[in-house]
């Protein structure tokens, strides 16, 4: 099956994250439209309708949809709306699908849909690589596959926003800071700067050190020399810009992975 083959049939991919949701219209492997909304607006079918109806108005030929979600309440509302609004297939990304990699996990039903889609995108978009896949958002996930496309394991940790929120909520006087506005230096000269820099450097340098260790594991234990580091998620461009190592950043990697899984399961 040539899953990369172009087609005239339009596909709606709904990527539901903890903070934001992306509605992406694909024709083949080309994204025609992207709309982002806050996930907390999608808790009801009416909320979904208000967000998605402009997309259907602009693309009346939409027939099929795939939903990739880490928020059950929003997923239920979106799927309910789509079943009543389109004539084609509505597919939900989960571990019951046919996957392009071997998933070794204690309980595959707990493996997040976003992680499934990201790993699928790695496997179906590239060949002859081992992969270290990062999704840097509200939480940060690391997933690792060898060049035989066997899932080796991963890590889940707080993202920048959660680290900032935790410092604020679990101390008496520390403010809630926005790390995206930090002026990068080594040391801060105010409480806000000290917090921003502490969060950013702790997260970035710690993450890069973990990646270095994973690369060594892949090289010496799995005998993989061609290793591709990829990243997606809202904070990926900022965080990876501070890396000393090369990293491929793809904003729509999870959406593309969901699209590829839809084709892979036809």
UniProtKB/Swiss-Prot annotation:
UniProt-recorded Gene Ontology molecular function terms: ATP binding; metal ion binding; pantothenate kinase activity
EC number per UniProt = 2.7.1.33
Q: How does it assemble?
A: Homodimer.
Subcellular location(s): the record lists: Cytoplasm
UniProt keyword terms in alphabetical order:
ATP-binding, Coenzyme A biosynthesis, Cytoplasm, Kinase, Metal-binding, Nucleotide-binding, Potassium, Transferase
Q: Which residues bind substrate?
A: 105, 112-115, 191
- NCBIfam families, per database record: baf (TIGR00671), PRK13320.1-1 (NF009849)
Which reaction(s) does its UniProt entry say it catalyses? (R)-pantothenate + ATP = (R)-4'-phosphopantothenate + ADP + H(+)
Protein name (record): Type III pantothenate kinase
Q: Does the keyword Transferase apply?
A: yes
What is the purpose of this protein?
Answer: Catalyzes the phosphorylation of pantothenate (Pan), the first step in CoA biosynthesis.
Cofactor(s) required for function per UniProt: NH4(+); K(+)
Give the GO cellular component terms, alphabetically. Answer: cytoplasm
* CDD domains reported for this sequence: ASKHA_NBD_PanK-III
- Note on cofactor: A monovalent cation. Ammonium or potassium.
| Biological process annotations from GO | coenzyme A biosynthetic process
């Amino acid at each position: 099956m040539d899953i990369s083959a172009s087609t005239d049939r339009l596909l709606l991919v709904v990527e539901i994250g903890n903070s934001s949701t992306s509605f992406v219209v694909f024709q083949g492997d080309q994204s025609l439209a992207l709309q982002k909304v806050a996930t907390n607006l999608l808790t009801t079918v009416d909320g979904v309708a208000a967000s998605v109806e402009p997309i259907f108005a602009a693309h009346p030929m939409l027939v099929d949809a795939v939903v990739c979600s880490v928020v059950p309440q929003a997923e239920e509302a979106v799927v309910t709306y789509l079943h009543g609004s389109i004539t084609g297939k509505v597919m939900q990304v989960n571990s019951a699908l046919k996957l392009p990699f071997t998933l070794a996990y204690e309980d595959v039903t707990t493996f997040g849909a976003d992680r499934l889609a990201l790993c699928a995108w790695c496997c179906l978009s590239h060949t002859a690589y081992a992969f270290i896949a990062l999704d840097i958002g509200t939480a940060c996930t690391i997933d690792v596959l060898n060049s035989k496309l066997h899932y080796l394991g991963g890590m889940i940790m707080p993202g920048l926003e959660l680290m900032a929120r935790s410092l604020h909520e679990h101390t008496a006087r520390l403010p809630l800071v926005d790390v995206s506005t930090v002026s990068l230096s080594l040391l801060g000269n105010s409480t806000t700067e000290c917090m921003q820099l502490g969060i950013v450097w702790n997260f970035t340098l710690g993450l890069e050190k973990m990646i270095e260790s994973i690369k060594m594991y892949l090289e010496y234990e799995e005998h993989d020399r061609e290793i591709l580091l990829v990243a997606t998620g809202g904070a990926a461009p900022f965080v990876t810009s501070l890396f000393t190592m090369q990293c491929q950043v793809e904003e729509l990697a999870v959406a593309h992975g969901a699209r590829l899984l839809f084709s892979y399961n036809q």
